Every structure is written in C-alpha cells, then in structure tokens.
C-alpha cells in the first residue's frame, strides 16, 4: 500500500469508493450532486491550499483523506474513507498521520470535521486522535455541510 497525492486518473475510483461507503454501508443517502468537491477535487482542495491523499493497493484506490483550507490556520478534515476489507489494518491511521503531518508542517491550528452519527467506529478513531466533540454553536469558524444527523469534532494543534 502506498499513499499519494490526488491524481486526476483516480477520480472515478475515488468517487465510486466514497459513494459506496456513504450510501451502501452507512446509508446516509448523500448523492454526488450534493458533493461538488468530488467532481472537481483539484479546484476544491489542491488549488485552494488543501490536500487530497489517496491510499493505493495494486493500482486500486482503497482509501482517501483530505482537508480544505478555511484560512487563518483553520482546516476541515474531509473524505476520510477506507474500503471495508482494508479496515483495521492501519490504513486509516497511515492516511491520517500523513495528512496530520502536512497540516502541522503548514502551520494549521484548528482542524474541524463533521461525521454522520451512525458511523460510531469513526467517532472512536477521532476521539482517540485527540478530537473533541463540539456543538454547532461552538464552531470556531463559519462552516456549512450537508447535515446527515452529523456530529462535529475539533482538534486544536
């Protein structure tokens, strides 16, 4: 397994993986049309100062993680997914550590994320990584997201 920065030729695999996990596994009913960032990853992430990392195994996308730059040393963690058969093998942790290294290196101070309430295993991961659950009223900066009974987490570096 290797982790690389986003490449355009991986776009469809990325979309397929994310939509499958969101809609088939988590059943949150979030169509591609409500995720314009997936249709133009380069513009929404890379060109705006963020990053989009991809875990690859034998040429196949098996995981993703990204962050969007929200200015003033603020970032939003996005699109953190690992294909079901590769979970609990350290791939998610490797993706997270690599992205966290980029965030620290670039001087980010606050990392926000939203996650569906039904994805309980991910909540444990975030809490173990130092994220604290917050309310909408505690958002440290303006952030809009497709709320699917979502929980918000914040990490202060």
Which functions belong to the PLM regions below?
Residues 1-2:
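Extreme N-terminal starter segment of soluble prokaryotic enzymes
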Residues 60, 83-97, 104-106, 111, ...:
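Conserved glycine-rich acetyl-CoA-binding loop
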Residues 34, 92, 146:
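Short, conserved glycine- and acidic-residue-centered signature motifs
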């Amino acid at each position: 397994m290797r982790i690389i920065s986003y490449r355009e030729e991986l776009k469809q695999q990325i979309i397929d993986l994310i939509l499958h996990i969101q809609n088939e596994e988590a059943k949150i009913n979030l169509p591609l049309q409500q995720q314009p960032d997936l249709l133009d990853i380069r513009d929404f992430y890379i060109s705006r100062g963020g990053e989009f990392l991809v875990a690859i195994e034998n040429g196949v996308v098996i995981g993703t993680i990204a962050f969007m730059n929200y200015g003033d040393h603020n970032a939003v963690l996005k699109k953190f997914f690992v294909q079901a058969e590769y979970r609990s093998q350290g791939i998610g942790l490797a993706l997270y550590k690599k992205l966290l290294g980029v965030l620290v290196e670039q001087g980010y101070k606050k990392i926000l994320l939203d996650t569906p309430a039904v994805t309980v295993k991910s909540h444990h991961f975030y809490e173990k990584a130092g994220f604290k659950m917050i309310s909408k009223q505690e958002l440290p900066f303006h952030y809009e997201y497709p709320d699917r009974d979502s929980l918000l987490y914040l990490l202060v570096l």
